[in-house]
Curated annotation (Swiss-Prot):
Gene3D superfamilies: 3.90.228.20, Phosphoenolpyruvate Carboxykinase, domain 1 (3.40.449.10), Phosphoenolpyruvate Carboxykinase, domain 2 (2.170.8.10). Binds 1 Mn(2+) ion per subunit. This is Phosphoenolpyruvate carboxykinase (ATP). Its cofactor is Mn(2+). Involved in the gluconeogenesis. Catalyzes the conversion of oxaloacetate (OAA) to phosphoenolpyruvate (PEP) through direct phosphoryl transfer between the nucleoside triphosphate and OAA. It comes from Aliivibrio fischeri (strain MJ11) (Vibrio fischeri). The gene is pckA. Monomer. InterPro entries: PEP_carboxykinase_ATP (IPR001272), PEP_carboxykinase_C (IPR013035), PEP_carboxykinase_N (IPR008210), PEPCK_ATP_CS (IPR015994).
Length: 540
């Protein structure tokens, strides 16, 4: 730390957050400092990072290898009681706690962080200065500071001078709540938000993604109320300035498909859409690494170098990484600053209005076509449905698909009612003349997953407009218009019925999946607008 940096850190008054007796503050340390801190030989347990042959540090996040939605809480008070989409109003994770319970949880975290040497990372959430959040993250764990330095937008020296946080995140991963039963909570772990105080607190879970997605949930509360779309999507832009956004749940291909050598990446996960166009919320990417190969995903593989941070991967004794090993979790990840990808929008991660909106789904039922163009009504229907499906493998190789319906392709992060996001998105799409497509990156009647080469060919056809020139035919039940051929794509997969030896198999699977869609969509039919959308969905 320079003398100047030391002075700046010393000027930070952490007592305003209830943190006392802090022995030292490292404010916005360099990557070099963080590397030294997180690989210190005296560190133990989950605090310790290990060096890998690719130059990046790998860490273990403990028993939590993903977010813990059952432990997510929001204070119900005058700020939130009438605006927030609460868990008793629909299928979501926004469980209410009282201000009194919040005070107890907050004091567990402040007690944990007091008297310690702390890392403070000040960063921005949102590339647009008018609507971004100034976020201050406080943690005692070096690699958690590294994670947020990667994931939030890094301020310049000048921007740090007068930095005043709009939101504070206190990560007390080592603190747990012994009184959770008395509080009526799910477990000793907690991720809680107070929108009046503008504070997030974390206890019991070490998973880095809680900090990133926590601020996403807050943007999802603040932006739509200003008429700005807040979206769980990746985005990129072509040479002619044509912007595409890719919505999708985890594992459907958002990061992979938006990282395209022919186009500049805007961002891989969280974006807003305002009067100027599409802008990234983040300063980094958070890519899945399970079964990562240099051949299939060279950009992501090459981004794993010094300053990237790997989570829960298997590191062999010779420092090499086994990306195929999912024994700890299938959700192995890497975070890296966005400039680790060569082809990005610079200097600010933003571009114009989107012309193409792509809904990614990984259908494990083998029913949906690899691509279909959506009508405006179908766009709303599929956005509110937010369907994907996972294959749950068992040791005997029996695989049953598990459907997931997640409103707006991100229900876990929504803080307002899903129809509010649909309304804002459709308004933005109409104003920009954008078109929507559904792209299935999942399985078909062959039992194999649609190849990444075919999916990339489909995306190319959407982006260059050749799909709009293609002849189409109608897929029954779901009433989807699909192309009969596309350049560079295996034509035999475009109608999913053709991938079955017996077409009746598709019929019975389609009926099963359609019933699931209809049952899920019933939650939106309590008003006229929702009822009117039913005919845009599957019909039996």
């Amino acid at each position: 730390m320079t003398v100047m940096e030391h002075k700046k850190a010393a000027l930070l008054d952490l007592t305003q957050y209830g943190l006392t007796g802090v022995t030292d503050v490292l404010r916005n340390p360099s990557y070099e400092q963080l590397f030294e801190e997180e690989t210190r030989p005296d560190l133990e347990g989950y605090e310790r990072g290990v060096m890998t042959e690719l130059g990046s540090v790998a860490v273990d996040t403990g028993i939590f290898t993903g977010r813990s939605p059952k432990d997510k809480y929001i204070v119900k008070d005058n700020t939130t009681k009438d605006t927030l989409w609460w868990s008793d109003q629909g299928k979501n994770d926004n469980k209410a706690i009282t201000p009194a319970v919040w005070d107890d949880l907050r004091s567990l975290v402040t007690t944990q962080l007091s008297g310690k040497r702390l890392f403070v990372i000040d960063g921005f959430c949102g590339a647009n200065p008018d609507t971004r959040l100034n976020v201050r993250i406080i943690t005692e764990v070096a690699w958690q500071a590294h994670f947020v330095k990667n994931m939030f937008i890094r301020p310049t020296e000048a921007e740090l001078e007068n930095f005043e946080p709009d939101f504070v995140v206190m990560n007390g991963a080592k603190a747990t709540n012994p009184n959770y039963e008395k509080h009526g909570l799910n477990s000793e772990n907690f991720v809680a938000f107070n929108l009046t105080e503008r504070v997030q607190i974390i206890g019991g879970t070490w998973y880095g993604g809680e900090m990133k997605k926590g601020m996403f949930a807050m943007m999802n509360y603040l932006l739509p109320l200003k008429g700005i779309a807040s979206m769980h999507c990746s985005a990129n832009v072509g040479e002619k300035g044509d912007v595409a956004v890719f919505f999708g749940l985890s594992g459907t291909g958002k990061t992979t498909l938006s990282t395209d050598p022919k186009r500049q990446l805007i961002g891989d996960d969280e974006h807003g859409w305002d009067d100027d166009g599409i802008f990234n919320f983040e300063g980094g990417c958070y890519a899945k690494t399970i079964r990562l190969s240099k051949e299939a995903e060279p950009d992501i593989y090459n981004a794993i170098r010094r300053d990237a941070l790997l989570e829960n991967v298997t590191v062999r004794s010779d420092s090499s990484i086994d990306f195929n090993d999912g024994s700890k979790t299938e959700n192995t990840r890497v975070s890296y600053p966005i400039y680790h990808i060569d082809n990005i929008v610079k200097p600010v991660s933003k571009a114009g209005h989107a012309k193409k909106v792509i809904f990614l789904t990984a259908d494990a039922f083998g029913v949906l076509p690899p691509v279909a163009k959506l009508t405006p009504e179908q766009t709303k229907y599929h956005f509110l449905s937010g369907f994907t499906a996972k294959l749950a493998g068992t040791e005997r190789g029996i695989t049953e698909p598990t459907p997931t319906f997640s409103a707006a392709f991100g229900a876990a992060f929504l803080t307002l009612h899903p129809t509010q996001y649909a309304e804002v998105l459709v308004k933005r799409m109409e104003a920009a003349g954008a078109e929507a497509y559904i792209v299935n990156t999942g399985w078909n009647g062959t039992g194999k997953r649609i190849s990444i080469q075919d999916t990339r060919g489909i995306i190319d056809a959407i982006l260059d407009g050749s799909i709009d020139q293609a002849k189409t035919k109608n897929i029954p039940v779901f009433n989807l218009e699909v192309p009969t051929s596309l350049p560079g794509v295996d034509a035999s997969i475009l109608d999913p019925r053709d991938t079955y030896t017996d077409p009746l198999q598709w019929d019975s699977k389609a009926e099963d999946l359609a019933q699931r869609f209809i049952k899920n969509f019933a939650q939106y039919t309590d008003n006229e607008e929702g009822k009117a959308l039913v005919k845009a969905g599957p019909q039996l």
